[in-house]
């Protein structure tokens, strides 16, 4: 480029003029096209210019660019064209300047877009690109219409071909210089042009270049400001080529054009319109050209101006092109770079611009006629070419402004619109109307102004024509310091300068205004784009503020939109208004930030985000660093009232729920969660809080009980045990379910005993707890006052949420009433001995708390609904029933029943002996009866201490006086201790032998079997409870009588009597001993039946118990049995649930096993795995809400049916039971050797085989009953499934089905893992120093693996629990209360029956293995 520029410097001005005359405007401009209409400022800002950015060659002085804009100009090419060495002596420069209309000549190949532009005198500003194009077109027009006199010499210039074809070579340049004088000689000027026309046909035919030209003859003088500018602002898509349609239009229009040309006026060099020889010659040349175009249609048509105003041709490669003069212009004179660019543009059909300005005002009617014909066709042809990007506004202007006269200067003004140039539009303040107003204004003043401007432009053109005709010396140089406007002013001074002054003033005012605005826009654009990315541009309103404030958050960017309608009006405001509005926006922006942005949290909240999850789970146990700040310490709590403590805990819970709540939860959901959590929390904690009733507190003080603060300390320590911790975590996490009670039962049994607290302290603590719970009970606070706190507390912990609330409401009040009555009744007349013994027992009983006994949880509340008298009678039984239910929940309920049976069957003398111990209990029993928590163990003097507790509660009711608070405590404890003591004194074997020795061994044996079942116990308990109602039941006779009366009175009595007989705890035992021994079997049967019917009611969920009295009595009996079991075992034993009361058969089996193992060590491993099964069951019950009564129901049914039809199996009844045994076992039994010739050990093995065979038979029967129950439950499940399917949505029904299906899978998996794990643990427990290290390592590895697998399975269980909650929530929407209870019962029963089935199968498997091993060990 620079080399080419240097070469151009050697050209003289005449050559420059010739080059200008060769029609640069018609030349293809590969670099800059219509896109120069796009403001450079906008292009640099938006980065969306349509072509590569090239600088304009130069800017004339009329543009008045200051130094800041000079960087946009190309000073090198300015010097190249306007050579400072040339002097304007003969006016050649002025001619050229006037010809070019104060534009720039794109000599270097950086051609500006081919736009006909305004003269400098036009009212409106014109861009340099437009001026340049206009100059070149004007030059070509003048050359065409030169002096007609010289046209006759047109054949004499053959060497111009070389001139046209060799411009790029130095010789070509020299030839240009040689031809200068000829070119500008008046005599030769028109000859050259004529020669061009003459050579056109040959050149076009040789090179195959097609040019369609329809209206050259219409190119008279060019007055753009007076012409309708249909395409003024258009960037023509078809600028690169003539579309087919346009080509057709040209052919069609030729005839019309020719006709027009014949009559059209033409302008001579003097500016006059003539129709002479010259015009006819020109027409002839054009006709020849048209013919040549038709013949060689393979060329490229670049652009066509249907009105003939200006032409731009797109030549083929290296082919000369024909300009409007008829001169051949070869594109090769451009440098190599530009030619390469042009080639690429041609191949891609890139933008080639045609700018059209019609000559309506000058050419007159003929031109108008042709314009009207071609206007629509050309518009279509231009628009159909979509290869070039178009500006939206331009296409609109084509349609809207066809009939309006718009000066070229409007182009830039209207380009700055919100649609096409939004950024410049905003930078200009939205005030483009100032530019557009003159254009659209049609008032007379404006029109006069436009006419004046048109005249001025015409005058300028006349000047340039006259100057062109004047000869100039070759050495004439352009003056360096003269600008275009200055040259125009020179001519103005010659002419008088009047029109020049008008022209300059109008031009300067508009140009200066435009330039100033452009400066501002450029500055803003540069400032914004120099350091901003497009995707990070500042929001537009900020540009009105010199120093916009820092934006605190990203929301600031979202606060404004560049597309809103309000924005446009905002930009038209003044600076002050913009600033003020921006300030307002700032404040609004801050508010928006608070809503949608990042939320700032306090340090305390931030700590919460990183708090330990395990701490969050402890709602009422321990403090967290910040959440418990409001809660007082234990020391301070003593000084606080109960209401304050509860209020603080409620506040903590609410705050914790708020902080832990998920951000994506709605406020309504959070409130609901908080409410639910609060309800659960209150349910759990109610029992641990003291009764606010002052009367109760006075009673506590009179009783010498520790105050609530002491008890709270005790309870907190108790809860610190692992079992309670686990339970509370479950509760706090909301994952606790109906089986929580079961879990905590087992945990609690082991937990309480190790506490090692004194019995008095524990007992007092228990009572305190109950006091707090009692306040919630039925109407009578008196009765509520006497309730046993320990029972309520345990109940609240162990039972399900529903159970807990229910127990707290009913049971606690009953216990309260009992305590209150107990206090009154302590003074009740009774055996002094009993009172003393009661006191003595108090110490013992305190040694064991209710928790230790495991019966602390009292579930029965139904009795509270009865009258106060009934409540008194029921108190003891109710408590016991709850305890019994608790035992029922625990896996060890069977053991308790067995123990109770043993006690019941225990020798009468033992009962008397127990009486000595329990005697005080009886007297205390009156007290105990008053204390609901005290065990209703004394039912009669005859019965062991356990019996006494049962009767004691009735007696307590009879004895309203409560003389000695200590007594009531003692009685409570006594009840437990006497029962346990009696049990300890009476070996299980003794009890069994007694049962057998009694006339009722079979029935009682059955009863013992029933004792496994929870219900029979309950029945027995119920009966004693009824007997308790008799006030003076201390004497065994009285108790038995009362019991008998109650039996007759109530339907429950027969049940209780039956149950009681086997249990032997209650007054029924007295009846059994004296009156009703023969009756017992019947009662047992009926009680069993009642049990079966009431089993579901006596399930873990106390609320479901159908018969409250019965349930309570049963609970009391169970509690007694538990106490006995625990005493027989050691209070410290944690595995009470594992250790069950053993029936006589079980004891016989154990004795046989011991004897056999002592003599045959080979059977040791197979005969001692029974504990594994129990441990597995315990593990399962800790995970699932076992409906123990329902599970036991099937076993009980089998035993009851057996009791009805036949006596208990005898040791030798092996063959009788063989019918239900597996065929393999039956075959072994039939093949066993004769006992006569066998030694002692073999006989024992034979006996053990028979025992195991009978066990297997029983298990098989139980399995049959269990399968029938499972079948029934499955039927219920199918009915439930059908109902759910009808009511729920398909996706909800699918969730329900998935949950039910996965429930069985998870239960089976957990049971299998638990069984395997317990087996491995048992094996590890037998490891000693003699065990192989490899075997030990294998056991450890298996244990670790199974433990991890079981933990994973527990995670599955946790997930299953969550899904259960979801399903329950779904069903709540569709099912009524009864249906919902049916669903819950179905799920619980399904789980319980499934676990029981697995347990039975495991038992049968174990017994079969034992049977086979023993049989194999027998001699042949």
From Swiss-Prot:
Q: Where in the cell is it found?
A: Apicolateral cell membrane; Apical cell membrane; Cytoplasm, Cytoskeleton
- Where composition is biased (Low complexity), the residues are 559-571, 787-798
A GO BP term here is:
actin filament organization
Q: Where is this region: Disordered?
A: 225-269, 556-582, 746-801, 827-848, 937-965, 1021-1082
Q: What is its main location?
A: membrane
What role does this protein play?
Induces gamma-tubulin accumulation at cell-cell junctions and may direct the assembly of robust microtubule arrays during cell elongation. May regulate the surface expression of amiloride-sensitive sodium channel.
The UniProt family comment states: Belongs to the shroom family.
Quaternary structure per UniProt?
Interacts with F-actin. Interacts with scnn1a.
Tell me the protein's name: Protein Shroom1
Q: Name the source organism.
A: Xenopus laevis (African clawed frog)
């Amino acid at each position: 480029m620079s080399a080419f520029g240097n070469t151009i410097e050697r050209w003289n001005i005449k050559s420059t003029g010739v080059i200008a005359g060769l029609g640069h405007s018609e030349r293809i401009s590969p670099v800059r096209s219509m896109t120069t209409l796009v403001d450079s400022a906008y292009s640099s800002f938006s980065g969306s210019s349509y072509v590569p950015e090239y600088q304009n060659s130069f800017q004339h002085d009329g543009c008045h660019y200051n130094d800041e804009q000079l960087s946009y100009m190309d000073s090198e090419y300015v010097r190249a064209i306007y050579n400072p060495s040339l002097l304007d002596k003969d006016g050649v420069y002025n001619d050229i300047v006037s010809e070019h209309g104060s534009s720039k000549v794109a000599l270097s190949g950086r051609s500006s877009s081919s736009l006909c532009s305004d003269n400098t005198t036009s009212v409106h500003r014109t861009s340099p690109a437009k001026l340049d194009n206009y100059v070149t077109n004007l030059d070509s027009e003048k050359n065409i219409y030169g002096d007609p006199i010289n046209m006759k010499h047109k054949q004499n210039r053959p060497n111009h071909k070389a001139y046209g074809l060799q411009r790029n070579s130095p010789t070509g340049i020299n030839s240009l210089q040689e031809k200068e004088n000829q070119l500008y000689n008046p005599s030769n000027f028109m000859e050259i042009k004529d020669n061009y026309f003459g050579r056109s046909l040959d050149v076009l035919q040789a090179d195959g270049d097609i040019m369609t030209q329809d209206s050259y003859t219409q190119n008279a003088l060019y007055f753009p400001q007076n012409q309708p500018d249909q395409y003024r602002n258009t960037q023509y898509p078809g600028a690169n080529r003539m579309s087919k349609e346009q080509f057709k239009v040209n052919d069609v229009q030729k005839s019309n054009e020719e006709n027009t040309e014949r009559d059209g006026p033409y302008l001579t060099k003097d500016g006059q319109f003539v129709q002479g020889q010259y015009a006819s010659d020109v027409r002839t040349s054009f006709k020849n050209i048209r013919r040549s175009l038709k013949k060689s249609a393979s060329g490229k048509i670049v652009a066509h101006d249907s009105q003939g105003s200006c032409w731009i041709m797109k030549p083929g490669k290296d082919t000369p092109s024909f300009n409007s003069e008829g001169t051949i212009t070869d594109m090769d004179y451009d440098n190599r770079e530009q030619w390469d660019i042009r080639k690429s543009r041609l191949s891609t059909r890139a933008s080639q611009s045609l700018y059209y300005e019609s000559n309506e005002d000058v050419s007159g009617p003929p031109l108008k006629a042709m314009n009207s014909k071609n206007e629509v066709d050309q518009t279509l042809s231009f628009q159909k070419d979509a290869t070039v990007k178009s500006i939206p506004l331009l296409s609109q202007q084509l349609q809207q402004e066809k009939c309006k006269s718009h000066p070229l200067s409007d182009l830039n003004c209207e380009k700055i619109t919100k649609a096409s140039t939004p950024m410049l539009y905003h930078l200009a303040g939205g005030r483009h109307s100032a530019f557009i107003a003159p254009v659209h204004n049609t008032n007379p003043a404006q029109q006069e102004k436009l006419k004046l401007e048109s005249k001025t432009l015409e005058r300028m053109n006349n000047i340039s024509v006259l100057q062109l005709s004047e000869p100039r010396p070759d050495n004439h140089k352009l003056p360096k310091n003269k600008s275009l406007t200055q040259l125009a002013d020179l001519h103005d001074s010659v002419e008088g300068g009047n029109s020049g002054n008008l022209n300059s003033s109008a031009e300067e005012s508009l140009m200066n205004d435009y330039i100033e605005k452009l400066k501002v826009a450029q500055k803003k654009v540069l400032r914004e784009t120099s350091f901003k990315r497009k995707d990070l541009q500042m929001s537009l309103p900020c540009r009105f503020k010199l120093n916009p404030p820092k934006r605190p958050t990203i929301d600031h960017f979202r606060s404004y939109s560049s597309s809103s309608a309000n924005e446009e009006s905002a930009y038209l405001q003044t600076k002050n208004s913009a600033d003020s509005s921006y300030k307002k926006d700032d404040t609004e922006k801050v508010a928006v930030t608070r809503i949608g942005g990042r939320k700032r949290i306090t340090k305390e909240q931030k700590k919460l985000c990183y708090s330990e999850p395990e701490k969050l789970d402890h709602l009422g146990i321990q403090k967290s660093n910040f959440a418990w700040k409001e809660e007082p310490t234990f020391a301070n709590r003593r000084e606080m009232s109960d209401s304050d403590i509860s209020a603080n805990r409620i506040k903590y819970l609410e705050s914790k729920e708020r902080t832990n709540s998920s951000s994506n939860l709605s406020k309504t959901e959070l409130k609901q969660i908080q409410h639910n959590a609060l309800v659960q929390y209150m349910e759990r904690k109610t029992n641990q809080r003291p009764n606010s009733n002052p009367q109760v507190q006075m009673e506590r003080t009179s009783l010498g009980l520790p105050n609530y603060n002491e008890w709270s300390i005790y309870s907190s320590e108790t809860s610190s045990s692992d079992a309670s911790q686990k339970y509370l975590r479950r509760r706090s996490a909301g994952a606790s379910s109906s089986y929580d009670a079961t879990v905590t039962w087992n945990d609690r049994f082991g937990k309480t005993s190790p506490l090692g607290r004194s019995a008095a302290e524990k007992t007092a603590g228990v009572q305190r707890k109950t006091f707090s719970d009692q306040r919630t009970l039925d109407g009578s606070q008196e009765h509520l006052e006497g309730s046993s706190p320990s029972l309520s507390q345990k109940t609240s912990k162990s039972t399900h949420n529903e159970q807990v609330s229910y127990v707290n409401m009913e049971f606690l009040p009953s216990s309260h009433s009992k305590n209150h009555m107990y206090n009154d009744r302590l003074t009740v007349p009774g055996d002094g001995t009993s009172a003393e013994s009661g006191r003595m027992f108090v110490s013992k009983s305190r040694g064991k708390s209710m928790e230790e006994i495991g019966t602390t949880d009292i579930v029965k509340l139904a009795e509270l609904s009865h009258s106060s008298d009934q409540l008194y009678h029921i108190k003891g039984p109710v408590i016991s029933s709850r305890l019994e239910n608790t035992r029922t929940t625990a896996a060890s309920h069977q053991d308790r029943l067995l123990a109770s049976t043993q006690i019941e069957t225990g020798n009468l003398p033992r009962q008397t002996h127990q009486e000595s111990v329990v005697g005080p209990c009886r007297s205390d029993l009156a007290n105990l009866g008053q204390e609901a928590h005290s065990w209703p163990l004394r039912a009669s003097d005859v019965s062991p201490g356990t019996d006494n507790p049962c009767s004691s509660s009735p007696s307590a009711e009879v004895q309203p006086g409560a003389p000695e608070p200590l007594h009531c405590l003692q009685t409570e404890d006594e009840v437990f201790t006497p029962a346990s003591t009696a049990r300890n004194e009476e070996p299980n074997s003794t009890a069994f032998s007694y049962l057998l020795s009694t006339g009722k061994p079979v029935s009682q044996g059955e009863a013992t079997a029933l004792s496994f079942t929870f219900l029979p116990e309950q029945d027995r308990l119920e009966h004693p409870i009824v007997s308790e109602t008799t006030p003076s039941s201390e004497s065994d006779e009285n108790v038995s009588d009362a019991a008998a009366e109650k039996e007759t009175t109530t339907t429950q009595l027969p049940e209780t009597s039956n149950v009681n007989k086997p249990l032997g705890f209650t007054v029924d035992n007295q009846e059994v001993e004296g009156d009703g021994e023969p009756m017992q079997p019947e009662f047992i049967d009926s009680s069993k039946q009642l049990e079966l019917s009431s089993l579901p009611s006596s399930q873990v969920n106390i609320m479901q118990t159908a018969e409250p009295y019965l349930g309570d009595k049963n609970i009391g009996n169970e509690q007694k049995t538990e106490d006995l079991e625990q005493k027989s075992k050691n209070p410290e034993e944690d595995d009470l649930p594992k250790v069950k009361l053993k029936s006589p058969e079980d004891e016989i089996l154990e004795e046989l096993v011991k004897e056999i193992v002592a003599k045959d060590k080979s059977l040791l491993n197979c005969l001692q795995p029974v504990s594994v099964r129990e441990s597995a069951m315990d593990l399962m019950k800790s995970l699932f809400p076992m409906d123990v009564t329902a599970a036991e129901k099937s076993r009980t049914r089998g035993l009851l049916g057996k009791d009805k039809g036949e006596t208990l199996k005898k040791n030798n009844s092996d063959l009788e039971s063989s019918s239900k045994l597996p065929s393999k076992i039956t075959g072994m039994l039939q093949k066993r050797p004769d006992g006569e010739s066998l030694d002692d050990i073999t006989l024992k093995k034979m006996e053990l085989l028979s025992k195991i065979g009978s066990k297997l038979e029983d298990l098989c029967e139980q399995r049959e009953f269990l399968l029938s129950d499972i079948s029934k439950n499955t039927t219920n499940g199918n009915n439930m499934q059908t109902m759910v399917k009808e009511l729920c949505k398909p996706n909800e029904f699918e969730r329900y089905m998935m949950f039910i299906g996965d429930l069985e899978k998870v239960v089976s998996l957990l049971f299998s893992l638990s069984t395997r794990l317990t087996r491995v643990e048992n094996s590890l427990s037998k490891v000693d120093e003699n065990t192989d290290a490899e075997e030990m390592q294998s056991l450890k590895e298996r244990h670790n693996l199974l433990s991890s697998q079981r933990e994973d399975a527990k995670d599955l269980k946790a997930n299953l629990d969550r899904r259960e909650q979801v399903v329950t929530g779904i069903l709540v929407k569709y099912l009524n209360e009864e249906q919902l209870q049916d669903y819950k019962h179905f799920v619980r029963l399904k789980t319980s029956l499934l676990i029981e089935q697995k347990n039975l199968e495991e038992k049968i498997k174990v017994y079969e293995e034992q049977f086979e091993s023993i049989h194999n060990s027998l001699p042949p």
